[in-house]
Each structure stands twice: as C-alpha cells, then as structure tokens.
Swiss-Prot record:
Catalyzes the reversible isomerization-deamination of glucosamine 6-phosphate (GlcN6P) to form fructose 6-phosphate (Fru6P) and ammonium ion. This is Glucosamine-6-phosphate deaminase. One of its GO terms (molecular function) is identical protein binding. SUPFAM superfamilies: NagB/RpiA/CoA transferase-like. The keyword Hydrolase applies. InterPro entries: Glc/Gal-6P_isomerase, Glucosamine6P_isomerase, Glucosamine6P_isomerase_CS, NagB/RpiA_transferase-like. Pathway: Amino-sugar metabolism; N-acetylneuraminate degradation; D-fructose 6-phosphate from N-acetylneuraminate: step 5/5. Belongs to the glucosamine/galactosamine-6-phosphate isomerase family. NagB subfamily. Keywords: Carbohydrate metabolism, Hydrolase.
Length: 236
C-alpha cells in the first residue's frame, strides 16, 4: 500500500483528485464511487476541475434498502447533489435498493461490474473497518449482497436522519471480492476515530474481523489519511 499522510481532508481531497485526473489521463473509463462525508472533498476538487466524465461510467458501492425513490437520504440523491449534477457521467450505476428481488438485483449488479471493470475505486472506511457495507464477518469472496447493518453503522449514519429509527437496517453492497477486482483502489480516512481501523488495515493481520484488511492482498492501493487517522501507525 502507498500511504499519503496529509494535513486535513481538504489537502486529502486535492490528493484524491490527482488520482482521478491521472486515471483519466491514462485512459480510465470506469470509476467506482463511494458516499459519506469522506470523499466529499475529492468530489469538490473534481467539480472545480475541467475533468469531463461524459464518456465515462460510474459504479457506486452501495445503497440503502427500502428508502422511497424521492428520499434525500438515498445514495442516489447524495451522488447527484455532490457530484453528478455538476459532473455527469455517460452512465451511472447504483444498486436498486427498492428492487422486489434483491438477490436478482445483486446478480445483475455483479454482471455490470463484470462488463465494466473498474479502473479506480474510491473507498472510505468505517470505525469497525467496514468498506462499502461489508461489515465484520463478511467473507473475502463475497460478491454483491444484501447486508444487515450493525448497530455501530446505524449509529454512525443516524446523524443524517431526523430520527434514529428512520435509519435503514439493510443495504445492498458490492462485496469484498467485487471491490478487489478494481485495478486501483483509493481509500481515504480522516480523524482520530478512524485510527484503529487504519492501523488494522495496514499493519494488522488479514482477517474478516476487519474487512478492510483484505486490501493488503491487492497490489495497487493508495491510502490518503490525515495525521489523526495515521496516529496509531508504527511506521509513518
């Protein structure tokens, strides 16, 4: 893993943007995207730039199950607000969390990934080491699947909802094996509350107890973290 330690998430966003710009320059056509607060500064830098994605495809990591189509908490809404409205893609794929048959939707999504290999995948990491909605215990060979969210993830996402009971209990997420197919993986993390997860991901054993640790088995991972998230690393 290549580790880049930055002052804060603003500087991290600039570093993340550089990877998107380099990927585009080198012919990348398919980008794996993530939601949440972590990638926002990278998306802001992309929006300010002259990068054009109208010839590119985006594939998002995950989506909540069961939210109304017009919900402003859906990841589809998030992506339009934070990137797509300003930088449209030729085609943008997100899992359909309202599908009547979620198992069939998961297989369909895996086929999309198979047909459009991801050149650059951006990730955040949860405090418990989850990537996408792949919670601790998720097998390394997992493909797109329905996920029961852990209480810690529900608690972390509750700030985006009016009431804690409004937070969905299920999501549909690319699996760890799906993510590992990406040619280049960028993972960003900011803040001291991510320090334990980052240490485990980089320096700990590869274990299903910390899903992000599987990234040690990928040969092209860039980690962008601030000093607080890097604070528990032995080698900096």
């Amino acid at each position: 893993m290549k580790v880049i330690i930055v002052k804060d998430n603003v500087e991290g966003g600039k570093e993340g943007y550089k990877l998107f710009a380099d990927a585009k320059k080198n012919g990348a056509t398919t980008f794996g995207l993530a939601t949440g607060s972590t990638p926002i500064t990278t998306y802001q830098e992309i929006i300010k730039s002259d990068l054009d994605f109208t010839d590119s495809i985006s594939i998002n990591l995950d989506e909540y199950v069961g939210l109304p189509e017009d919900s402003d908490q859906s990841y589809d809404y998030f992506m339009h607000e934070n990137l797509f409205n300003a930088k449209p893609f030729k085609h943008s794929y997100l899992p359909n969390g309202r599908a009547a048959d979620l198992e069939a939707e998961a297989k369909h999504y895996d086929q999309i990934i198979e047909d459009n290999p991801i050149d650059l995948q951006i990730l955040g990491i949860g405090r418990n080491g989850h990537i996408g909605f792949n919670e601790p215990g998720t097998p390394a060979d997992s493909t797109t699947h329905k996920v029961s969210l852990t209480q810690s993830t529900i608690d972390a996402n509750a700030r985006f909802f009016e009431h804690e009971e409004d937070v969905p209990r299920y999501a549909i997420s690319m699996g760890l094996a799906s993510i590992m197919k990406s040619k280049h993986i960028l993972i960003e993390a900011y803040g001291e509350d991510k320090a334990d997860a980052i240490k485990g991901m980089i320096e700990g054993p590869v274990t299903t107890d910390l899903p992000a640790s599987v990234l040690q088995n990928h040969d092209n991972v860039t980690v962008i973290i601030d000093e607080a998230a890097a604070s528990k690393l032995s080698n900096k």
